[in-house]
């Protein structure tokens, strides 16, 4: 072995051995407990970033530790390969999305392999491959048969210049990102999945999951189970009687209704706008806004009076109807009751347009004022009804019950449970996605593609130009025959939401070569024992994958109803930011590698200059690594300079997995320095370590006993920390071990070999290359087998036994020294030793002991 640690040589040698042995290819084994750990599959954007490195290293550490502990472990990998970024890159570069995607996959796969990850590449999938998305199509058709998938009109963002549908993120300040045209809302037919059918189960099953509480709460809020009242305001229009239906969780405030607001797309709005250009113009303006709920929440609230009124169902009073841009047709009934006295949004709307505000609940000790909104106005818990006739004095629950009963008696409505969750619209008017397997026949209508004709293959040679869907222009794809009548027909050109692709890939990993969607192997591996990914996926991906799993279960494909038992949301990787700002306020961001920072005498940054010109740049603070802030660190540069093990060690040591990690060049250098020490000790003591000298534990000297006691004590803590996923303290434990071994004076070769072997095994899951090569070079592999499957070291409890223990010695309650006594010393022997100790003589001022307090195993206090 080399005297000097050369990461490139060490890692090439270790990876060569692993490839030759096909070390990570995994099969089902009923004789072992299984552990299936999955990192959320990446989008093949071009290069790995440090967030990827951290995620996959956490997974890899878990895999290796559990494999050493006798588990049948599996770590697969794949590519979430469909999606809009590929189309955008294709337009920018004039190449098909397929080429861009596959090139990126090749490069990123090479990066992963250079990290030494324990991935079973025989299970690799790419969601853009027909053998994968065939099963998206197959399950979609099964859902169509069961009524879980259905078609209805939905609202989309329409760019009138590019003649294309835009995703919410492509609408910038109400305009198309490419054309700059004002975006319109359009109603088009789309396919939906009835996720609402599973709302109760999705909510209730959260209780049994080992997921972060924060994620569970986010899902609970997204599902949004509400108990309230659904009722209608009666009206008559053109001789027809009807109800304007609303849902409210605050029926206790019904006597405070002073207006109703309806969505621009509401059928009543359409009727009222007939012959009224001003109303129609406002409706058109609303339709030009984005359809994202977040956009609606933050935009300026606008409205227009329709001149029409409905009737309050309990008072008989006229209630004005307004059209509001903040009311979404896709939520609730597309109409809301306006209670400005007790709803902050309604309060602002009423103040803006001079609408009446009526107080109908009061809280003791609080004074109501129309001058400004106060938090208690909307508090249902500390208030009672006022100015509400027969409901005066009632608290929230009593008032809701009474109002609901009266509405029901009048035929206007009743109590209802509603959900914030809406059915999942899966149609996307994009090219690079799973084709929806439907054929449009002029005679037969919408016809599902027969199962034997799946997959409907997406052409991979098209280049989007930003004007419409390329599939609609591809005659080879578009034209087909109707499976029912044989007439000329057209294929559906919409593709599926890419969240479909990521909703079940972890199940396909378990049976990647199956000629069915999944098989018996899936029930062996699933559900995942550990899922790892960012908190940003807490709602959509994780909710959709739970729904998809439950559908697969109900169709008899699998026996489980949840995809993941446990979830780890790793923290973000942060780094410093630096920028310059021009006269227009535009900021140019500079990478930390291109900046020199000056510090004060306490190490705090006080200034920075750009290396290229020596001129100052502004310190922007620590933020998440991102392209927009140009503060990322290229993992490949790091690996090339320091080696993969250093990158792995730093990302595991710098912070616990679930917390944010602040990047530190000094920390990386420290990790590299530690690995050089590990190697140097092995190389410098290779003769003693490789000699395989034995020893008799009973006859060891004090130095050997002390070293073994320290190593096994630290091992016990490291093992505990591995189990609770606190890998930063595992690394700390390994550092303690190395210090103890390196500093041991008088330890014999046999004990050095034993304790260094423990260190290598403790470090191996975190830094597999250097430990694997040292294990082999020093002969441990000949004794225990390759480090890949070497047994995890067991704590030698006998080594932890001490003949003597050390007690704190106090005089009059103050610590004055330490007292060594035999482990099994009697109370009397301890008292005698304490009084005889020089510390007592020094601090007792010659006075005799009046009382001696002994706390077994801890301290002795002599009172004089």
Swiss-Prot record:
It is an enzyme of class 6 (ligase). Pfam families: Anticodon_1 (PF08264), tRNA-synt_1 (PF00133), tRNA-synt_1_2 (PF13603), tRNA-synt_1g (PF09334). Its main location: cytoplasm. Transmembrane segments: none annotated. A motif ('HIGH' region) lies at residues 42-52. The keyword Glycosyltransferase does not apply. It is found in: Cytoplasm. GO terms for molecular function: aminoacyl-tRNA deacylase activity; ATP binding; leucine-tRNA ligase activity. A motif ('KMSKS' region) lies at residues 624-628. PROSITE patterns: AA_TRNA_LIGASE_I. Keywords: Aminoacyl-tRNA synthetase, ATP-binding, Cytoplasm, Ligase, Nucleotide-binding, Protein biosynthesis. This is Leucine--tRNA ligase.
């Amino acid at each position: 072995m080399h005297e000097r640690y050369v990461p490139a040589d060490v890692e090439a040698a270790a990876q060569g051995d692993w490839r030759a042995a096909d070390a990570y290819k995994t099969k089902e084994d009923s004789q072992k407990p299984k552990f299936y750990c999955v990192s959320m599959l990446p989008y093949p954007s071009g290069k790995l970033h440090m967030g990827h490195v951290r995620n996959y290293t956490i997974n890899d550490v878990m895999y290796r530790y559990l494999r050493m502990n006798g588990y049948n472990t599996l770590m697969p990998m794949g590519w979430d390969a469909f999606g809009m970024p590929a189309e955008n890159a294709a337009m920018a570069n004039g190449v098909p999305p397929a080429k861009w995607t596959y090139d990126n996959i090749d490069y990123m796969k090479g990066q992963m392999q250079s990290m030494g990850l324990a991935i079973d590449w025989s299970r690799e999938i790419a969601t853009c491959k027909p053998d994968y998305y065939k099963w998206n199509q197959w399950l979609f058709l099964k859902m169509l048969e069961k009524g879980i998938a259905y078609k209805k009109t939905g609202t989309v963002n329409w760019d009138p210049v590019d003649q294309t549908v835009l995703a919410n993120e492509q609408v910038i300040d109400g305009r198309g990102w490419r054309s700059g045209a004002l975006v319109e809302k359009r109603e088009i037919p789309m396919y939906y999945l009835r996720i609402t059918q599973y709302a109760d189960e999705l909510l209730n099953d959260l209780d049994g999951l080992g997921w972060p509480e924060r994620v569970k709460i986010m899902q609970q809020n997204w599902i949004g189970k509400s108990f309230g009242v659904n009722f209608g305001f009666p009206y008559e229009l053109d001789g027809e009687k009807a109800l304007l239906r609303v849902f409210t969780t605050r029926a206790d405030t019904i006597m405070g209704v002073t207006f109703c607001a309806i969505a621009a797309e509401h059928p009543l709005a359409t009727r009222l706008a007939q012959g009224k250009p001003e109303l129609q113009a406002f409706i058109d303006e609303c339709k030009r806004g984005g359809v994202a709920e977040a956009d609606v929440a933050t935009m300026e609230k606008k409205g227009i009076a329709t001149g029409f009124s409905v009737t309050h169902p309990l008072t008989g009073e006229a209630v004005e109807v307004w059209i509001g841009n903040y009311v979404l047709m896709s939520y609730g009934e597309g109409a809301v009751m306006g209670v400005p006295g007790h709803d902050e949004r309604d309060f602002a709307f009423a103040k803006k347009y001079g609408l009446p505000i009526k107080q109908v609940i009061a809280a003791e000790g609080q004074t109501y004022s129309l001058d400004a909104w106060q938090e208690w106005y909307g508090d249902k818990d500390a208030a009672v009804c006022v100015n509400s006739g027969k409901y005066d004095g009632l608290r929230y629950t009593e008032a809701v019950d009474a109002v609901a009963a009266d509405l029901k008696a009048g035929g206007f409505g009743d109590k209802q449970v509603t959900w914030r969750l809406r059915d999942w619209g899966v149609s996307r008017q994009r090219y690079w996605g799973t084709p929806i397997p439907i054929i449009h026949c002029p005679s037969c209508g919408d016809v599902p593609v027969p199962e034997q004709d799946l997959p409907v293959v997406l052409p991979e040679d098209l280049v989007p130009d930003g004007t419409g869907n390329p599939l609609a222009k591809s005659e080879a794809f578009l034209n087909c025959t109707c499976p029912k009548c044989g007439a000329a027909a057209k294929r559906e050109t919409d593709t599926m939401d890419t969240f479909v692709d990521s909703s079940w890939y972890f199940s396909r990993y378990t049976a990647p070569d199956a000629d069915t969607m999944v098989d018996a192997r899936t029930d062996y591996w699933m559900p995942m024992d550990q899922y790892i990914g960012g908190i940003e996926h807490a709602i959509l991906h994780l909710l959709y994958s739970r729904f998809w799993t439950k559908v697969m279960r109900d169709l008899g494909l699998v026996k489980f109803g949840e995809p993941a038992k446990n979830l780890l949301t790793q923290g973000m990787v942060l780094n410093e930011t630096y920028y310059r700002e021009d006269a227009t306020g535009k900021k140019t961001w500079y990478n930390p590698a291109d900046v020199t920072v000056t510090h004060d005498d306490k190490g705090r940054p006080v200034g920075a200059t750009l290396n290229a010109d020596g001129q100052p740049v502004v310190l922007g603070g620590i933020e998440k690594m991102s392209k927009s802030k140009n503060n990322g660190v290229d993992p490949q540069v790091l690996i090339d300079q320091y080696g993969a093990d250093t990158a792995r060690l730093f990302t595991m040591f710098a912070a616990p997995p679930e917390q944010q990690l602040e990047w530190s060049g000094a920390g990386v250098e420290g990790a590299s320095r530690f690995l050089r020490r590990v190697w140097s000790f092995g190389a410098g003591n290779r003769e003693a370590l490789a000699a395989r000298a034995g020893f008799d534990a009973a006859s060891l000297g004090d130095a050997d006993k002390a070293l073994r006691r320290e190593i096994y004590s630290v091992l016990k803590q490291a093992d505990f920390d591995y189990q609770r996923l606190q890998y930063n303290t595992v690394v700390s434990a390994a550092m303690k071990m190395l210090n103890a071994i390196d500093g041991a004076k008088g330890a014999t070769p046999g004990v050095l070999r034993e304790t260094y072997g423990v260190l290598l095994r403790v470090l191996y899951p975190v830094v597999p290359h250097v430990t694997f090569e040292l294990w082999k070079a020093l002969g441990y592999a000949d004794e225990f087998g390759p480090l890949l499957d070497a047994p995890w070291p067991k704590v030698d409890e006998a080594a932890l036994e001490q003949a003597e223990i050390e007690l704190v010695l106090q005089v009059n309650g103050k610590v004055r020294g330490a007292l060594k006594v035999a482990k099994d010393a009697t109370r009397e022997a301890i008292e005698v030793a304490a009084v005889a100790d020089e510390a007592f003589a020094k601090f007792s001022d010659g006075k005799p002991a009046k009382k001696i307090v002994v706390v077994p195993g801890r301290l002795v206090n002599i009172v004089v």
